[in-house]
Curated annotation (Swiss-Prot):
It catalyses: L-arginine + H2O = L-citrulline + NH4(+). This is Arginine deiminase. The active site is at 401 (amidino-cysteine intermediate). It is found in: Cytoplasm. Keywords: Arginine metabolism, Cytoplasm, Hydrolase. It comes from the Bacteria. Its main location: cytoplasm. Its EC number is 3.5.3.6. One of its GO terms (molecular function) is arginine deiminase activity. The gene is arcA. Pathway: Amino-acid degradation; L-arginine degradation via ADI pathway; carbamoyl phosphate from L-arginine: step 1/2.
Amino acid sequence: MTDGPIKVNSEIGALKTVLLKRPGKELENLVPDYLDGLLFDDIPYLEVAQKEHDHFAQVLREEGVEVLYLEKLAAESIENPQVRSEFIDDVLAESKKTILGHEEEIKALFATLSNQELVDKIMSGVRKEEINPKCTHLVEYMDDKYPFYLDPMPNLYFTRDPQASIGHGITINRMFWRARRRESIFIQYIVKHHPRFKDANIPIWLDRDCPFNIEGGDELVLSKDVLAIGVSERTSAQAIEKLARRIFENPQATFKKVVAIEIPTSRTFMHLDTVFTMIDYDKFTMHSAILKAEGNMNIFIIEYDDVNKDIAIKQSSHLKDTLEDVLGIDDIQFIPTGNGDVIDGAREQWNDGSNTLCIRPGVVVTYDRNYVSNDLLRQKGIKVIEISGSELVRGRGGPRCMSQPLFREDI
């Protein structure tokens, strides 16, 4: 099979192409009163966040990675006027709660913008002061202090979550929180209309119309045969089963097993990749709380049963044994965040110490602030490339969260 624009058969194969989103004006539309609704704990300083992100991108380029930007691809995908019009309609249709019937005024604003300006504006949000329409609804006469007709999308620089590259296909995800649900509309248009992707017959394992929630931070490609997916606050068991069935029924897919790993439903354990990432053939970073749960975990191995022509599910309580079995590795090493210390581990977990981006076997990108975890990784033979993330981390995501691999070399 000839390689297309998407190929990800592992977490550790040499990274060749990655999708990023440079932080933009959406971060400056964060205000204290509405942080919770937009899933932020704090407000990053945009200028510094952009410098940190630019350095992250440059580090990847220096390691031979082609860096693509979501915002640029999205703008290039709506060159056709009809596609642009459909894109605007789709965005507004998913924003009815806030636009209060002012579609035409917002469209008039959009009509003054270039394709890139349009994409940037949709990402950053539309403030009410930008259009000042005549009041036509009773609700508009009320003392509503909410400042936006179109909400900002400050989480977009975490490109891992709205989509996930799996094999030669992709999931276009239905996000759990309303604040993030519109994010996957960009990759939908990119895959369907961008010249780089539109004629590649890319399998869509799940699309954003799927009724079940799934997010890319819970989707890990351990090998060409095995996926690991977190059952979390943001990813449902129903979505995992649907994904497994779609992959198993595709004759071009190589995956034979899907390992569903239940994790606690809290912000500290937002996604599987915030507590667990693969960094070498036999090494994983791991939050100590997961290590302590060993022997009492809910792990489910989903396979296709050729005899019964249906999926079969086996249960396990030991993550180490399960991974060694499905990956065919004798002795997997778990490397604890913050060396498992009750203080260092908790602090560095909060700052995404487990959320490493592997760019080839045994080489990872991490935040420099997680120095205890980074030193331990080096002791275990891992090459650690550190980046500054004092502002980026305020969104509660690390290098893996901020990147969506589109192409990795096979291992």
